[in-house]
Amino acid sequence: MAVAAAAAATAMSAAGGGGASAARSISRFRGCLAGALLGDCVGAVYEAHDTVSLASVLSHVESLEPDPGTPGSARTETLYYTDDTAMTRALVQSLLAKEAFDEVDMAHRFAQEYKKDPDRGYGAGVITVFKKLLNPKCRDVYEPARAQFNGKGSYGNGGAMRVAGISLAYSSVQDVQKFARLSAQLTHASSLGYNGAILQALAVHLALQGVSSSEHFLEQLLGHMEELEGDAQSVLDAKELGMEERPYSSRLKKVGELLDQDVVSREEVVSELGNGIAAFESVPTAIYCFLRCMEPHPEIPSTFNSLQRTLIYSISLGGDTDTIATMAGAIAGAYYGMEQVPESWQQSCEGFEETDVLAQSLHRVFQESS
């Protein structure tokens, strides 16, 4: 193993499987949703920028820090969340209301959230789905998504960006996979869309356990995805798009190869893994950001902790910055816990208090009662 990968493995072990003590602790639950929110709010500033300079991101996040000895945030203007957080919250609210996954309730909450607050940056495709779901004549909540793109369904990252709550509510791998898929299929019917949501949910699931090494983390993800992507629908969907067989598995292998290199440019990461709105161009990228940033980064000051470093690095890759950062933030937050969520960043982001209440409620309903 190269120096970089060995250092990442050491970082995981040194953190004791994460800085948040016990597996599935309340600190990890809170850190997960907080990390997702911070990634969305901080990343949204740069969304759709093809290239983002690291210096610009560092300047942006440094503006959140107060002067030494001054509490709170230095910002006077709030950083607003996007559809990523709006959908994440709707998913969690449905899980809490039903104390289980309920596709009808969740679909209606997604659609009602859009209707109530449509200016959060929703894509045109998913708006069509929501409008159909709002029609009282809609009898099958999965049908609008299946009809997308001439019946092929969407392979965007919208199912993955909001999925963290599934990993918090369900503790078994089987349940995480099942309900990540079902929740994603409400808007993303292509296997290339919902398999991305499953991969993201599994990454959060493993982070909540505090997996002991980056190598083991990747091995487990790869084992699950190779099995999932072997099914007939996944093979067909990849073939129809002219992609390699098992696109997620192949990208996870690339993640491992990049981690084995001591120095990797951000341009190479984007070239190899992507930074786009397709789930296969963003979920593996978010996982790479989390694993790469377990160790110090030469261009990111050591005054930033591992969670902050993950978000800064994610955003510096450009492209779909808010979604890649929200996914990387959910994984990192689940791993490091609430201890690494800086108060100044919390106070800069819209909706932090509500998000924190949702995380604590999830822990009480699904973890403490189990």
From Swiss-Prot:
**What Pfam families does the record tag this protein with?**
ADP_ribosyl_GH
- Explain the regulation of its activity: The protein undergoes a dramatic conformational switch from closed to open states upon substrate-binding, which enables specific substrate recognition for the 1''-O-linkage. The glutamate flap (Glu-47) blocks substrate entrance to Mg(2+) in the unliganded closed state. In presence of substrate, Glu-47 is ejected from the active site: this closed-to-open transition significantly widens the substrate-binding channel and precisely positions the scissile 1''-O-linkage for cleavage while securing tightly 2'- and 3'-hydroxyls of ADP-ribose.
Please indicate which residues carry the site annotation Glutamate flap. Answer: E47
**Superkingdom of origin:** Eukaryota
Q: What is this protein called?
A: ADP-ribosylhydrolase ARH3
Q: What is its EC number?
A: 3.5.1.-, 3.2.1.143, 3.2.2.-
Catalysed conversion reaction:
[(1''->2')-ADP-alpha-D-ribose](n) + H2O = [(1''->2')-ADP-alpha-D-ribose](n-1) + ADP-D-ribose; 1''-O-acetyl-ADP-alpha-D-ribose + H2O = ADP-D-ribose + acetate + H(+); O-(ADP-D-ribosyl)-L-seryl-[protein] + H2O = ADP-D-ribose + L-seryl-[protein]; alpha-NAD(+) + H2O = ADP-D-ribose + nicotinamide + H(+)
Organism for this UniProt entry? Mus musculus (Mouse)
A single GO cellular-component term on record: nucleus
